[in-house]
A protein has these predicted regions:
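Hydrophobic alpha-helical transmembrane segments of multi-pass inner-membrane transport and secretion
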Residues: 14-40, 280-302
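Short beta-strand boundary microenvironments
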Residues: 88-178, 183-206, 214-222
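Short amphipathic alpha-helical coupling segments at ligand-binding clamshell hinges
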Residues: 74-82, 153-154, 239-247
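"Rare, low-scoring activations can occur
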Residues: 160-165, 184-284
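Short amphipathic alpha-helices in soluble, non-transmembrane regions
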Residues: 82-86, 170-173, 243-254
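A short amphipathic helical element positioned immediately N-terminal to and/or at the very start
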Residues: 3-12, 82
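Membrane-proximal extracellular/periplasmic loop immediately following the first transmembrane helix
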Residues: 36-120, 125-127
Length: 302
């Protein structure tokens, strides 16, 4: 405290004799104000809720290969059987199978839907089974839950951001407004409810997404040999530091289907960390905090 007061007295004595010092301090004040405000915005954006929850969520790592006892099995068959087995595990609260649809994941697909033929919105496609919303604890319409949405690409649930984009361009837009595939005015896509606002990563804005529910028939017909992702939520009472180890040792062998093997269950918090490191999200806050600290030290020592 004495050190700070001493420096303030020195600054004041110099101010009385040199107007340039005042200008210099004013400039430093402006820069510091800008940096602190920017840092505050970054931290607020970084730590505000994402709109979904990844606590107790895991992603299966699967391997397909080796000798097969049933040559008629497709990848879709294997994944669906593994999903059914996983859903029956006592420690599992919810599970879902999806294609290119995980949050904080580099694999994405996009498409456009239109209202009144010409009002188009482009958004990320979420192709998944009904358990997806429960796995990530997203918010959907209790009157029109995602799990009850008819399967297929003729029925869609819009995320709040996608709904808002339509409404911005068409003020009368509602859940009863019929949609069509962009460029194909003869197609009809019926809306279900809405998915609450969420962001796919820390510094992203609310994500516009089209949610399509897939049943077994659709998956077997259109995703025969595609690579799928399986995620699941563990009951809080069953989760813990040893769950991953116990899962690999005890549960994973029960999920194997022919030549599909479950190699690991990765906590989704690790997926989040890897994604943020790759995108430099954590560095944005840390680097700016270092600059602010450096300037503060220089002000009091200079």
């Amino acid at each position: 405290m004495k050190f700070i007061l001493h420096n303030l007295r020195m600054i004041w004595s110099r101010l009385r004799s040199n107007g340039w010092v005042l200008a210099e301090l004013f400039l430093v004040f402006v820069v510091m104000w800008f940096l602190c405000d920017s840092l505050g915005c970054l931290k607020y954006t970084f730590y505000r809720p994402l709109g979904y929850n990844i606590d107790h969520v895991y992603r299966l790592t699967t391997i397909i290969g080796g000798a097969t006892s049933d040559t008629t099995l497709t990848n879709a068959d294997r994944y669906l059987r593994a999903l059914k087995k996983l859903e029956q595990e006592p420690s599992v609260e919810a599970a879902a199978l999806c294609y290119w649809s995980l949050p904080m994941h580099g694999s994405n697909s996009y498409s456009s839907l239109a209202a009144q033929d010409t009002i188009g919105v482009n958004a990320r496609i979420i192709n998944t089974t009904g358990g997806y919303i429960n796995v990530f604890r997203m918010s959907d319409d209790p009157q029109r839950p995602f799990v009850e949405t008819p399967s297929g690409w003729d029925n869609v649930m819009l995320s709040q951001a996608a709904f808002d984009r339509f409404q911005k361009r068409m003020p009368t837009f509602s859940l009863d407004t019929p949609l069509s595939k962009y460029g194909d005015s003869t197609s009809v896509v019926t809306q279900g409810g809405k998915i609450g606002a969420f962001r796919t990563y820390r510094y992203g804005s609310d994500a516009p997404c089209f949610f399509y529910r897939m049943d077994e028939n659709l998956i077997k017909r259109h995703f025969t040999d595609e690579w799928a992702q399986i995620v699941f939520r563990v009951k809080p009472a069953a989760d813990g530091p040893d769950y991953r180890t116990n899962f690999i040792r005890e549960i994973a062998p029960r999920l194997d289907v022919d030549d599909l093997f479950v190699a690991d269950a990765v906590p989704y918090t690790e997926q989040q960390l890897q994604f943020e490191v790759m995108n430099g999200d954590t560095d944005k806050v840390n680097s700016q905090a270092i600059v602010v600290l450096f300037l503060l030290v220089n002000v009091f020592l200079g």
